[in-house]
């Protein structure tokens, strides 16, 4: 089998199949994401999705745990820094947000992600 085809099956088809199977069991979006994270704890995209789902449903303590775990496992996952910092600002925790933004600015700079870098610098200047 072609290595690219194998990667497509593992990273695209398998998760979609899993979603369809789980959806048939009437799982919530959060339960589906939790199952993905349990299956692949190092998968940044799944953990980011879970953290964002927790933010969107108001479970900020679970969101914080997932953002911190994500950044511990995948320190180069730049979008997480901005979203985590925005959540902390809404939670009236500007000092914590500053710390996350400073880490995120460093990560975005290393990654060459100028858009995220400018957004994080702008948010940091507002705090």
Model-identified regions with their sequence ranges:
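Structural marker of alpha-solenoid helical repeat scaffolds
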Residues: 39, 73, 107-111
């Amino acid at each position: 089998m072609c290595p690219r085809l194998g990667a497509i099956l593992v990273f695209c088809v398998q998760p979609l199949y899993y979603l369809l199977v789980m959806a048939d069991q009437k799982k919530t979006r959060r339960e589906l994401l939790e199952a993905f994270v349990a299956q692949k704890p190092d998968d940044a995209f799944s953990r980011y999705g879970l953290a964002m789902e927790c933010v969107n449903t108001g479970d900020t303590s679970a969101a914080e745990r997932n953002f911190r775990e994500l950044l511990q496992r995948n320190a180069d996952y730049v979008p997480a820094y901005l979203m985590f910092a925005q959540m902390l600002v809404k939670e009236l925790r500007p000092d914590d947000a500053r710390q996350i933004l400073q880490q995120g600015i460093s990560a975005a700079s290393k990654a060459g992600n100028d858009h995220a870098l400018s957004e994080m610098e702008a948010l940091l200047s507002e705090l």
